[in-house]
Amino acid sequence: MKLSQDTERNTNPYIDNSFFHQNYKNVNVLLFVPHQDDEINAAASLLFTIARCEARITLVYTTNGDWECPAAVRFNEAINAAGVLGIPEENILFMGYGDTLNRNDKRHVFYHTDTPARSAAGYTETYGTDAHPDFAFLQEKQHHSYTNENYLKDLLSIIRLTKADIIIGTDFDCHADHRMLSLYLDKAIGMVRKEDPSYQPEVWKRFAYPLAFNAVADYSSVNNPETKKPVVGDTHNYKFSIIGFFYFIWKERIRIPVPAMARTDTFRDNIICQALEQHVSQRIVTEVTRILNSDEIFWFRRTDCVSHTADITVSSGNGTYLNDFMVYNVTNIDDDVPEYTDYCWRPEAEDPDKTAVFKWKKPVTVEKIVLYGAVSTDNKIDRLMVTLSNGFSQTVKGLPPNGNPLEIVTGKQENITTCILKILSATGTDYGISECEIYSSKEFTNKIAPFCKILIEDNFAYEYFVNKKVKVLPLTVYTYGNTGTITLTVENGNSVIRDGKLFIADTDQKIFIRAQNKEGSVWDQIIIKRLSWFDLKRKKLSDIADRIYLKNRKRQLKHN
Protein backbone atom coordinates (compact mmCIF):
# COMPACT_ATOMS: atom_id res chain seq x y z
CA MET A 1 0.00 0.00 0.00
CA LYS A 2 1.54 3.29 -1.14
CA LEU A 3 1.03 6.44 0.90
CA SER A 4 0.70 9.93 -0.51
CA GLN A 5 3.56 12.42 -0.41
CA ASP A 6 0.96 15.15 -0.93
CA THR A 7 -0.49 15.09 2.58
CA GLU A 8 -0.64 18.74 3.62
CA ARG A 9 -4.42 18.78 3.43
CA ASN A 10 -5.15 15.19 2.48
CA THR A 11 -6.79 13.54 5.47
CA ASN A 12 -6.80 10.20 3.65
CA PRO A 13 -3.21 9.51 2.61
CA TYR A 14 -4.27 6.23 1.00
CA ILE A 15 -5.97 8.23 -1.78
CA ASP A 16 -3.16 8.65 -4.26
CA ASN A 17 -1.96 8.11 -7.82
CA SER A 18 1.35 7.37 -9.50
CA PHE A 19 0.72 10.49 -11.63
CA PHE A 20 1.74 12.62 -8.62
CA HIS A 21 5.03 10.76 -8.02
CA GLN A 22 6.97 11.22 -11.25
CA ASN A 23 10.37 12.83 -11.68
CA TYR A 24 10.20 15.62 -14.26
CA LYS A 25 13.43 17.30 -13.21
CA ASN A 26 14.76 17.22 -16.78
CA VAL A 27 11.45 18.15 -18.43
CA ASN A 28 11.11 21.69 -19.77
CA VAL A 29 7.52 22.97 -20.02
CA LEU A 30 6.38 26.13 -21.82
CA LEU A 31 2.91 27.56 -21.17
CA PHE A 32 1.42 30.31 -23.35
CA VAL A 33 -1.71 32.13 -22.13
CA PRO A 34 -3.26 35.45 -23.21
CA HIS A 35 -4.12 37.06 -19.87
CA GLN A 36 -3.03 37.12 -16.25
CA ASP A 37 -5.40 34.53 -14.67
CA ASP A 38 -5.58 32.26 -17.74
CA GLU A 39 -2.75 30.20 -16.28
CA ILE A 40 -5.37 28.87 -13.85
CA ASN A 41 -8.13 28.35 -16.40
CA ALA A 42 -5.68 26.70 -18.78
CA ALA A 43 -3.72 24.27 -16.62
CA ALA A 44 -3.78 24.89 -12.85
CA SER A 45 -3.85 21.25 -11.70
CA LEU A 46 -1.31 20.11 -14.27
CA LEU A 47 1.03 23.00 -13.47
CA PHE A 48 0.84 22.44 -9.72
CA THR A 49 1.49 18.71 -10.14
CA ILE A 50 4.44 18.87 -12.52
CA ALA A 51 5.98 21.78 -10.58
CA ARG A 52 6.02 19.55 -7.49
CA CYS A 53 7.60 16.85 -9.68
CA GLU A 54 10.42 19.34 -10.40
CA ALA A 55 9.60 20.23 -14.01
CA ARG A 56 10.99 23.55 -15.18
CA ILE A 57 7.99 25.66 -16.21
CA THR A 58 8.21 28.87 -18.24
CA LEU A 59 4.98 30.88 -18.15
CA VAL A 60 4.34 33.37 -20.97
CA TYR A 61 1.59 36.00 -21.03
CA THR A 62 0.99 37.37 -24.54
CA THR A 63 -0.97 40.46 -23.41
CA ASN A 64 -0.60 42.82 -20.48
CA GLY A 65 -4.21 42.40 -19.38
CA ASP A 66 -4.51 46.17 -19.59
CA TRP A 67 -8.05 46.56 -20.93
CA GLU A 68 -9.24 48.21 -17.73
CA CYS A 69 -6.50 47.52 -15.21
CA PRO A 70 -2.88 48.78 -15.26
CA ALA A 71 -0.32 46.24 -16.44
CA ALA A 72 1.71 46.63 -13.24
CA VAL A 73 -1.25 45.43 -11.17
CA ARG A 74 -1.90 42.47 -13.46
CA PHE A 75 1.80 41.54 -13.46
CA ASN A 76 1.99 41.46 -9.66
CA GLU A 77 -1.19 39.41 -9.41
CA ALA A 78 0.14 36.94 -11.99
CA ILE A 79 3.47 36.57 -10.21
CA ASN A 80 1.70 35.87 -6.92
CA ALA A 81 -0.70 33.35 -8.47
CA ALA A 82 2.09 31.58 -10.32
CA GLY A 83 4.01 31.37 -7.05
CA VAL A 84 1.08 29.61 -5.42
CA LEU A 85 1.17 27.03 -8.24
CA GLY A 86 4.94 26.59 -7.87
CA ILE A 87 6.25 28.72 -10.75
CA PRO A 88 9.03 31.13 -9.69
CA GLU A 89 8.94 34.79 -10.74
CA GLU A 90 12.10 34.48 -12.82
CA ASN A 91 10.36 31.92 -15.06
CA ILE A 92 7.63 34.34 -16.16
CA LEU A 93 7.76 36.25 -19.45
CA PHE A 94 5.48 39.07 -20.60
CA MET A 95 5.20 39.61 -24.37
CA GLY A 96 3.57 42.98 -23.75
CA TYR A 97 0.74 43.15 -26.31
CA GLY A 98 -2.54 44.95 -25.70
CA ASP A 99 -5.54 43.33 -24.01
CA THR A 100 -8.64 43.47 -26.22
CA LEU A 101 -12.20 42.26 -26.56
CA ASN A 102 -14.17 41.02 -29.58
CA ARG A 103 -15.06 44.33 -31.24
CA ASN A 104 -15.44 43.74 -35.00
CA ASP A 105 -13.63 47.01 -35.77
CA LYS A 106 -10.35 45.39 -36.92
CA ARG A 107 -8.38 47.10 -34.15
CA HIS A 108 -6.87 43.86 -32.91
CA VAL A 109 -3.18 43.23 -33.61
CA PHE A 110 -4.34 40.10 -35.48
CA TYR A 111 -5.38 42.28 -38.44
CA HIS A 112 -2.33 44.58 -38.49
CA THR A 113 0.63 43.60 -40.66
CA ASP A 114 2.15 46.90 -41.78
CA THR A 115 0.77 49.58 -39.47
CA PRO A 116 0.70 48.96 -35.70
CA ALA A 117 -2.55 48.44 -33.86
CA ARG A 118 -3.50 50.80 -31.05
CA SER A 119 -4.65 48.97 -27.94
CA ALA A 120 -7.57 49.96 -25.74
CA ALA A 121 -4.97 51.21 -23.24
CA GLY A 122 -3.51 53.50 -25.90
CA TYR A 123 -0.28 51.65 -26.72
CA THR A 124 1.13 50.83 -30.16
CA GLU A 125 4.17 48.82 -29.07
CA THR A 126 5.06 46.21 -26.49
CA TYR A 127 5.84 47.35 -22.99
CA GLY A 128 6.33 46.01 -19.49
CA THR A 129 7.40 47.38 -16.13
CA ASP A 130 10.79 48.31 -14.71
CA ALA A 131 10.91 45.00 -12.87
CA HIS A 132 9.53 43.00 -15.81
CA PRO A 133 10.27 44.49 -19.24
CA ASP A 134 8.48 43.02 -22.23
CA PHE A 135 10.15 40.05 -23.92
CA ALA A 136 11.24 41.94 -27.05
CA PHE A 137 13.00 44.56 -24.93
CA LEU A 138 14.69 41.86 -22.85
CA GLN A 139 16.05 40.23 -26.00
CA GLU A 140 16.69 43.15 -28.33
CA LYS A 141 16.68 46.27 -26.12
CA GLN A 142 13.82 47.63 -28.19
CA HIS A 143 10.04 47.29 -28.10
CA HIS A 144 8.04 45.67 -30.88
CA SER A 145 5.25 47.55 -32.63
CA TYR A 146 1.82 45.95 -32.40
CA THR A 147 1.78 43.94 -35.64
CA ASN A 148 0.91 40.32 -36.22
CA GLU A 149 4.37 39.72 -37.68
CA ASN A 150 6.02 40.87 -34.46
CA TYR A 151 3.59 38.79 -32.40
CA LEU A 152 4.60 35.73 -34.41
CA LYS A 153 8.26 36.69 -34.18
CA ASP A 154 8.06 36.82 -30.38
CA LEU A 155 6.34 33.42 -30.20
CA LEU A 156 9.03 31.94 -32.43
CA SER A 157 11.82 33.50 -30.37
CA ILE A 158 10.44 32.13 -27.10
CA ILE A 159 10.00 28.63 -28.53
CA ARG A 160 13.52 28.66 -29.97
CA LEU A 161 14.93 30.04 -26.72
CA THR A 162 13.33 27.49 -24.39
CA LYS A 163 13.24 24.41 -26.68
CA ALA A 164 10.57 23.08 -24.33
CA ASP A 165 9.74 19.38 -24.23
CA ILE A 166 6.06 20.21 -23.69
CA ILE A 167 4.26 23.26 -25.07
CA ILE A 168 0.87 24.08 -23.52
CA GLY A 169 -1.46 26.74 -24.83
CA THR A 170 -5.01 27.99 -24.57
CA ASP A 171 -7.10 26.95 -27.52
CA PHE A 172 -9.72 28.57 -29.74
CA ASP A 173 -11.98 30.12 -27.07
CA CYS A 174 -14.55 32.83 -27.78
CA HIS A 175 -12.17 35.66 -26.79
CA ALA A 176 -10.21 37.28 -29.64
CA ASP A 177 -6.93 37.22 -27.68
CA HIS A 178 -7.33 33.50 -27.05
CA ARG A 179 -8.10 32.86 -30.70
CA MET A 180 -5.06 34.74 -31.96
CA LEU A 181 -2.78 32.91 -29.55
CA SER A 182 -4.18 29.51 -30.56
CA LEU A 183 -3.79 30.15 -34.30
CA TYR A 184 -0.38 31.80 -34.11
CA LEU A 185 1.00 29.24 -31.69
CA ASP A 186 0.13 26.46 -34.15
CA LYS A 187 1.69 28.50 -36.95
CA ALA A 188 4.85 29.09 -34.93
CA ILE A 189 5.22 25.43 -33.98
CA GLY A 190 4.86 24.43 -37.63
CA MET A 191 7.55 26.92 -38.64
CA VAL A 192 9.98 25.85 -35.91
CA ARG A 193 9.50 22.20 -36.83
CA LYS A 194 10.48 22.91 -40.44
CA GLU A 195 13.56 24.84 -39.30
CA ASP A 196 14.69 22.07 -36.96
CA PRO A 197 13.08 18.65 -37.60
CA SER A 198 14.94 17.18 -34.62
CA TYR A 199 12.90 19.40 -32.29
CA GLN A 200 9.70 17.47 -31.54
CA PRO A 201 7.81 18.90 -28.55
CA GLU A 202 4.53 17.57 -27.25
CA VAL A 203 1.72 20.06 -27.78
CA TRP A 204 -1.10 20.21 -25.21
CA LYS A 205 -3.99 22.65 -25.63
CA ARG A 206 -7.06 23.40 -23.55
CA PHE A 207 -10.14 25.57 -23.85
CA ALA A 208 -9.90 27.96 -20.92
CA TYR A 209 -13.44 29.34 -21.12
CA PRO A 210 -15.97 26.52 -21.75
CA LEU A 211 -13.97 24.03 -19.64
CA ALA A 212 -13.21 26.38 -16.74
CA PHE A 213 -14.08 30.09 -16.59
CA ASN A 214 -17.51 29.71 -18.26
CA ALA A 215 -18.08 26.03 -17.46
CA VAL A 216 -21.06 24.64 -15.57
CA ALA A 217 -21.03 25.85 -11.94
CA ASP A 218 -21.43 22.31 -10.64
CA TYR A 219 -18.80 22.06 -7.90
CA SER A 220 -19.65 19.80 -4.97
CA SER A 221 -17.58 18.83 -1.96
CA VAL A 222 -19.17 15.38 -2.24
CA ASN A 223 -18.09 13.49 -5.38
CA ASN A 224 -17.16 16.63 -7.30
CA PRO A 225 -18.19 15.91 -10.91
CA GLU A 226 -16.03 15.57 -13.99
CA THR A 227 -15.67 18.38 -16.52
CA LYS A 228 -18.81 18.45 -18.63
CA LYS A 229 -18.80 18.68 -22.40
CA PRO A 230 -19.82 22.26 -23.27
CA VAL A 231 -23.02 22.72 -25.26
CA VAL A 232 -23.84 25.72 -27.45
CA GLY A 233 -26.76 27.59 -25.92
CA ASP A 234 -26.41 25.89 -22.53
CA THR A 235 -22.83 26.60 -21.46
CA HIS A 236 -22.39 30.23 -20.40
CA ASN A 237 -21.31 32.52 -23.27
CA TYR A 238 -20.76 29.50 -25.54
CA LYS A 239 -22.02 30.47 -28.99
CA PHE A 240 -19.66 28.45 -31.15
CA SER A 241 -18.14 25.01 -30.67
CA ILE A 242 -15.03 23.59 -32.26
CA ILE A 243 -15.27 20.51 -30.02
CA GLY A 244 -16.27 17.62 -32.24
CA PHE A 245 -14.31 19.07 -35.15
CA PHE A 246 -10.75 18.31 -36.27
CA TYR A 247 -8.85 16.53 -33.47
CA PHE A 248 -11.08 17.92 -30.70
CA ILE A 249 -12.98 14.67 -30.28
CA TRP A 250 -14.52 14.47 -26.81
CA LYS A 251 -13.91 10.77 -26.24
CA GLU A 252 -10.23 11.28 -27.10
CA ARG A 253 -9.63 14.10 -24.64
CA ILE A 254 -6.85 13.72 -22.09
CA ARG A 255 -8.12 13.77 -18.52
CA ILE A 256 -5.64 14.77 -15.80
CA PRO A 257 -6.15 13.72 -12.15
CA VAL A 258 -6.54 16.53 -9.63
CA PRO A 259 -4.02 16.72 -6.75
CA ALA A 260 -5.11 16.47 -3.13
CA MET A 261 -4.58 20.17 -2.47
CA ALA A 262 -7.15 20.94 -5.18
CA ARG A 263 -9.67 18.55 -3.58
CA THR A 264 -10.00 20.04 -0.11
CA ASP A 265 -13.22 20.16 1.89
CA THR A 266 -13.35 23.96 1.80
CA PHE A 267 -12.44 26.61 -0.75
CA ARG A 268 -10.22 28.40 1.76
CA ASP A 269 -7.80 25.45 1.79
CA ASN A 270 -7.94 24.74 -1.95
CA ILE A 271 -4.68 25.53 -3.77
CA ILE A 272 -6.49 26.58 -6.96
CA CYS A 273 -8.79 28.85 -4.99
CA GLN A 274 -5.73 30.37 -3.31
CA ALA A 275 -4.21 31.04 -6.74
CA LEU A 276 -7.47 32.59 -7.94
CA GLU A 277 -7.50 34.85 -4.88
CA GLN A 278 -4.30 36.52 -6.11
CA HIS A 279 -6.14 37.98 -9.12
CA VAL A 280 -8.06 40.48 -7.03
CA SER A 281 -8.64 42.94 -9.88
CA GLN A 282 -10.47 40.28 -11.90
CA ARG A 283 -12.64 38.92 -9.07
CA ILE A 284 -12.13 35.52 -10.68
CA VAL A 285 -12.26 33.64 -7.37
CA THR A 286 -16.03 34.05 -7.55
CA GLU A 287 -16.02 31.66 -10.54
CA VAL A 288 -14.35 28.86 -8.59
CA THR A 289 -17.44 26.62 -8.71
CA ARG A 290 -17.05 26.55 -12.50
CA ILE A 291 -13.30 25.94 -12.45
CA LEU A 292 -13.00 23.07 -9.95
CA ASN A 293 -13.77 19.57 -11.24
CA SER A 294 -12.51 16.06 -10.65
CA ASP A 295 -10.40 16.18 -13.82
CA GLU A 296 -8.63 18.68 -16.08
CA ILE A 297 -9.11 18.34 -19.84
CA PHE A 298 -6.58 18.70 -22.66
CA TRP A 299 -6.06 17.69 -26.26
CA PHE A 300 -2.67 16.47 -27.45
CA ARG A 301 -0.83 16.68 -30.78
CA ARG A 302 2.32 14.97 -31.95
CA THR A 303 5.00 16.96 -33.75
CA ASP A 304 7.25 14.11 -34.90
CA CYS A 305 5.69 13.73 -38.35
CA VAL A 306 8.16 13.52 -41.24
CA SER A 307 5.75 15.36 -43.54
CA HIS A 308 7.12 18.62 -42.10
CA THR A 309 10.46 17.88 -43.76
CA ALA A 310 9.04 17.04 -47.19
CA ASP A 311 8.89 19.24 -50.27
CA ILE A 312 5.32 19.36 -51.56
CA THR A 313 4.11 19.80 -55.12
CA VAL A 314 0.43 19.81 -56.06
CA SER A 315 -1.35 19.57 -59.39
CA SER A 316 -3.38 22.67 -58.44
CA GLY A 317 -4.34 24.66 -55.36
CA ASN A 318 -2.17 25.67 -52.40
CA GLY A 319 -0.14 22.76 -51.10
CA THR A 320 1.55 24.68 -48.27
CA TYR A 321 -1.48 24.04 -46.05
CA LEU A 322 -0.74 20.30 -46.05
CA ASN A 323 2.22 20.41 -43.66
CA ASP A 324 1.93 23.72 -41.77
CA PHE A 325 0.65 22.15 -38.48
CA MET A 326 -2.56 24.20 -38.76
CA VAL A 327 -5.61 21.98 -39.18
CA TYR A 328 -7.90 25.03 -39.24
CA ASN A 329 -7.69 28.79 -39.65
CA VAL A 330 -9.93 31.87 -39.66
CA THR A 331 -9.45 35.40 -40.97
CA ASN A 332 -11.90 36.99 -38.50
CA ILE A 333 -11.32 36.30 -34.80
CA ASP A 334 -14.09 38.65 -33.62
CA ASP A 335 -17.17 36.90 -35.02
CA ASP A 336 -19.18 34.85 -32.54
CA VAL A 337 -19.31 32.08 -35.15
CA PRO A 338 -16.21 32.41 -37.33
CA GLU A 339 -15.81 30.85 -40.76
CA TYR A 340 -12.93 28.46 -41.42
CA THR A 341 -10.82 29.89 -44.24
CA ASP A 342 -7.34 29.58 -45.73
CA TYR A 343 -6.56 26.21 -44.18
CA CYS A 344 -7.03 23.54 -46.88
CA TRP A 345 -5.41 22.24 -50.01
CA ARG A 346 -8.32 22.46 -52.45
CA PRO A 347 -7.46 21.30 -55.99
CA GLU A 348 -9.24 23.10 -58.79
CA ALA A 349 -12.48 21.49 -59.99
CA GLU A 350 -11.19 21.10 -63.56
CA ASP A 351 -7.87 19.58 -62.41
CA PRO A 352 -7.80 16.03 -63.89
CA ASP A 353 -5.04 14.82 -61.53
CA LYS A 354 -5.89 16.28 -58.10
CA THR A 355 -2.64 15.04 -56.60
CA ALA A 356 -0.25 16.14 -53.87
CA VAL A 357 3.28 14.74 -53.84
CA PHE A 358 5.47 14.68 -50.71
CA LYS A 359 9.15 14.25 -51.59
CA TRP A 360 12.06 13.75 -49.19
CA LYS A 361 15.73 14.45 -49.91
CA LYS A 362 16.66 11.54 -47.63
CA PRO A 363 14.58 8.34 -47.41
CA VAL A 364 12.19 8.05 -44.47
CA THR A 365 10.20 5.32 -42.77
CA VAL A 366 6.41 5.52 -42.92
CA GLU A 367 4.17 3.62 -40.50
CA LYS A 368 1.10 5.84 -40.13
CA ILE A 369 -0.59 8.63 -42.10
CA VAL A 370 -3.22 10.94 -40.60
CA LEU A 371 -5.42 13.04 -42.90
CA TYR A 372 -7.70 15.92 -41.91
CA GLY A 373 -10.39 16.98 -44.37
CA ALA A 374 -12.27 20.22 -44.87
CA VAL A 375 -15.31 21.17 -42.80
CA SER A 376 -18.33 21.07 -45.09
CA THR A 377 -21.80 19.55 -44.87
CA ASP A 378 -22.29 19.11 -48.61
CA ASN A 379 -18.75 18.68 -49.97
CA LYS A 380 -16.45 15.78 -49.25
CA ILE A 381 -13.74 13.52 -50.60
CA ASP A 382 -15.33 10.16 -51.39
CA ARG A 383 -12.29 8.15 -52.51
CA LEU A 384 -8.59 8.86 -52.08
CA MET A 385 -5.50 6.82 -52.93
CA VAL A 386 -2.21 6.90 -51.02
CA THR A 387 0.87 5.61 -52.83
CA LEU A 388 4.41 5.28 -51.47
CA SER A 389 7.59 5.08 -53.54
CA ASN A 390 8.18 1.43 -52.60
CA GLY A 391 4.94 0.36 -54.29
CA PHE A 392 2.66 0.41 -51.25
CA SER A 393 -0.79 1.68 -52.21
CA GLN A 394 -4.09 1.95 -50.37
CA THR A 395 -7.43 3.42 -51.39
CA VAL A 396 -9.63 4.85 -48.65
CA LYS A 397 -13.34 5.46 -48.96
CA GLY A 398 -14.04 8.95 -47.77
CA LEU A 399 -12.65 11.24 -45.10
CA PRO A 400 -14.60 11.60 -41.83
CA PRO A 401 -16.97 14.56 -41.41
CA ASN A 402 -16.13 17.75 -39.49
CA GLY A 403 -12.48 17.64 -40.47
CA ASN A 404 -11.95 14.71 -38.07
CA PRO A 405 -8.75 12.72 -38.62
CA LEU A 406 -8.51 9.57 -40.71
CA GLU A 407 -5.69 7.24 -39.64
CA ILE A 408 -4.08 5.00 -42.23
CA VAL A 409 -1.76 2.43 -40.65
CA THR A 410 0.61 1.37 -43.41
CA GLY A 411 2.79 -1.01 -41.47
CA LYS A 412 6.51 -0.24 -41.45
CA GLN A 413 7.43 0.99 -44.94
CA GLU A 414 11.13 1.80 -45.20
CA ASN A 415 13.31 3.84 -47.58
CA ILE A 416 10.40 5.99 -48.73
CA THR A 417 11.26 8.98 -50.93
CA THR A 418 7.77 10.00 -52.09
CA CYS A 419 4.18 9.82 -50.87
CA ILE A 420 1.39 10.66 -53.31
CA LEU A 421 -2.15 11.62 -52.34
CA LYS A 422 -4.61 11.39 -55.22
CA ILE A 423 -8.27 12.36 -54.91
CA LEU A 424 -10.17 9.82 -57.02
CA SER A 425 -13.71 11.11 -56.50
CA ALA A 426 -15.48 13.80 -54.50
CA THR A 427 -18.87 15.35 -53.89
CA GLY A 428 -19.25 19.07 -54.59
CA THR A 429 -16.35 21.47 -55.10
CA ASP A 430 -15.60 22.82 -51.60
CA TYR A 431 -13.68 19.77 -50.39
CA GLY A 432 -10.02 19.52 -49.47
CA ILE A 433 -7.33 18.30 -47.07
CA SER A 434 -6.20 20.60 -44.27
CA GLU A 435 -3.27 18.57 -42.98
CA CYS A 436 -1.38 15.40 -43.85
CA GLU A 437 0.68 14.00 -40.98
CA ILE A 438 3.08 11.23 -41.97
CA TYR A 439 4.73 9.35 -39.11
CA SER A 440 7.69 6.99 -38.97
CA SER A 441 6.25 5.29 -35.89
CA LYS A 442 2.69 4.39 -35.04
CA GLU A 443 3.01 5.46 -31.40
CA PHE A 444 4.64 8.39 -29.64
CA THR A 445 6.48 8.28 -26.32
CA ASN A 446 5.22 11.15 -24.19
CA LYS A 447 7.17 13.02 -21.54
CA ILE A 448 4.16 12.81 -19.23
CA ALA A 449 4.32 9.32 -17.78
CA PRO A 450 1.45 6.86 -18.34
CA PHE A 451 -1.20 6.85 -15.62
CA CYS A 452 -4.59 5.40 -14.79
CA LYS A 453 -7.61 6.63 -12.86
CA ILE A 454 -10.53 4.73 -11.38
CA LEU A 455 -13.89 5.89 -12.71
CA ILE A 456 -17.31 5.62 -11.13
CA GLU A 457 -19.99 6.51 -13.69
CA ASP A 458 -17.37 8.36 -15.79
CA ASN A 459 -16.31 10.50 -12.83
CA PHE A 460 -12.74 10.46 -11.50
CA ALA A 461 -13.10 8.94 -8.04
CA TYR A 462 -10.91 9.84 -5.06
CA GLU A 463 -12.79 9.76 -1.74
CA TYR A 464 -16.17 8.64 -3.03
CA PHE A 465 -19.32 8.72 -0.92
CA VAL A 466 -22.33 6.48 -1.50
CA ASN A 467 -25.60 5.87 0.26
CA LYS A 468 -25.52 2.75 2.43
CA LYS A 469 -28.42 1.38 0.42
CA VAL A 470 -26.28 1.17 -2.72
CA LYS A 471 -25.16 -2.43 -3.25
CA VAL A 472 -23.52 -2.28 -6.69
CA LEU A 473 -21.26 0.36 -8.26
CA PRO A 474 -19.87 0.35 -11.82
CA LEU A 475 -16.07 0.57 -11.86
CA THR A 476 -13.99 1.32 -14.94
CA VAL A 477 -10.46 2.60 -15.47
CA TYR A 478 -9.30 5.54 -17.56
CA THR A 479 -5.78 5.17 -18.94
CA TYR A 480 -3.30 7.54 -20.54
CA GLY A 481 -0.26 6.30 -22.42
CA ASN A 482 1.02 2.75 -22.63
CA THR A 483 -0.01 1.49 -19.20
CA GLY A 484 -0.35 -2.19 -20.02
CA THR A 485 -3.18 -4.18 -18.49
CA ILE A 486 -4.69 -2.57 -15.39
CA THR A 487 -6.14 -4.78 -12.65
CA LEU A 488 -8.65 -3.61 -10.04
CA THR A 489 -8.51 -5.10 -6.55
CA VAL A 490 -10.30 -4.56 -3.24
CA GLU A 491 -7.62 -4.15 -0.57
CA ASN A 492 -9.77 -4.66 2.51
CA GLY A 493 -13.12 -6.06 3.54
CA ASN A 494 -15.52 -8.47 1.90
CA SER A 495 -16.67 -6.50 -1.15
CA VAL A 496 -15.70 -7.97 -4.53
CA ILE A 497 -15.14 -6.70 -8.07
CA ARG A 498 -16.66 -8.78 -10.84
CA ASP A 499 -17.40 -7.94 -14.49
CA GLY A 500 -16.65 -4.26 -14.07
CA LYS A 501 -18.84 -3.85 -11.00
CA LEU A 502 -18.18 -3.50 -7.29
CA PHE A 503 -20.51 -5.69 -5.24
CA ILE A 504 -20.61 -4.06 -1.81
CA ALA A 505 -20.69 -6.21 1.31
CA ASP A 506 -23.00 -5.02 4.09
CA THR A 507 -20.15 -5.32 6.59
CA ASP A 508 -17.87 -2.88 4.73
CA GLN A 509 -18.08 0.80 5.70
CA LYS A 510 -14.89 1.90 3.93
CA ILE A 511 -13.73 0.11 0.80
CA PHE A 512 -10.13 0.60 -0.32
CA ILE A 513 -9.65 -0.04 -4.05
CA ARG A 514 -6.41 -0.14 -6.02
CA ALA A 515 -5.82 -0.15 -9.77
CA GLN A 516 -2.37 -1.23 -10.93
CA ASN A 517 -0.49 -2.51 -13.95
CA LYS A 518 1.63 -5.66 -13.86
CA GLU A 519 4.89 -3.80 -13.29
CA GLY A 520 3.47 -1.65 -10.48
CA SER A 521 4.63 1.54 -12.20
CA VAL A 522 1.09 2.77 -12.88
CA TRP A 523 -1.42 2.76 -10.04
CA ASP A 524 -4.37 4.55 -8.47
CA GLN A 525 -5.96 4.24 -5.03
CA ILE A 526 -9.39 5.40 -3.91
CA ILE A 527 -11.68 5.00 -0.91
CA ILE A 528 -15.41 4.41 -1.14
CA LYS A 529 -17.25 5.46 2.01
CA ARG A 530 -20.77 4.33 2.80
CA LEU A 531 -22.95 6.86 4.61
CA SER A 532 -26.55 7.10 5.66
CA TRP A 533 -28.88 9.50 3.85
CA PHE A 534 -28.62 11.87 6.82
CA ASP A 535 -24.80 11.73 6.94
CA LEU A 536 -24.59 12.42 3.20
CA LYS A 537 -26.73 15.52 3.66
CA ARG A 538 -24.60 16.62 6.59
CA LYS A 539 -21.46 16.06 4.54
CA LYS A 540 -22.77 18.51 1.95
CA LEU A 541 -23.09 21.27 4.54
CA SER A 542 -19.57 22.37 3.63
CA ASP A 543 -21.01 23.39 0.25
CA ILE A 544 -23.27 25.84 2.05
CA ALA A 545 -20.31 27.24 3.96
CA ASP A 546 -18.42 27.62 0.68
CA ARG A 547 -21.34 29.44 -0.95
CA ILE A 548 -21.48 31.85 2.00
CA TYR A 549 -17.73 32.38 1.67
CA LEU A 550 -18.10 33.20 -2.04
CA LYS A 551 -21.03 35.52 -1.40
CA ASN A 552 -18.97 37.44 1.15
CA ARG A 553 -15.98 37.56 -1.21
CA LYS A 554 -18.15 38.98 -3.99
CA ARG A 555 -19.35 41.70 -1.64
CA GLN A 556 -15.81 42.49 -0.49
CA LEU A 557 -14.35 42.53 -4.00
CA LYS A 558 -17.15 44.72 -5.29
CA HIS A 559 -16.22 47.43 -2.80
CA ASN A 560 -12.44 47.19 -3.35
Feature map (PLM): residue ranges:
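Active-site beta-strand->loop->alpha-helix modules in alpha/beta enzyme cores, enriched
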Residues: 2-198
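Extracellular/luminal low-complexity segments enriched in Ser/Thr/Pro
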Residues: 497-507, 512
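Disordered, acidic Ser/Thr/Pro-rich linker "stalks" and the adjacent N-terminal cap
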Residues: 300-366, 374-381, 435-449
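Trp- and acidic/polar-enriched beta-sheet ligand-binding modules for extracellular glycan
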Residues: 350-352, 364, 375-444
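C-terminal accessory domains and tails appended to enzymatic cores
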Residues: 6-15, 104-111, 123-142, 154-157, ...
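Solvent-exposed, low-complexity, repeat-rich "mucin-like" stalks and linkers
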Residues: 450-484, 541-546
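Edge beta-strands of extracellular beta-sandwich domains
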Residues: 522-530
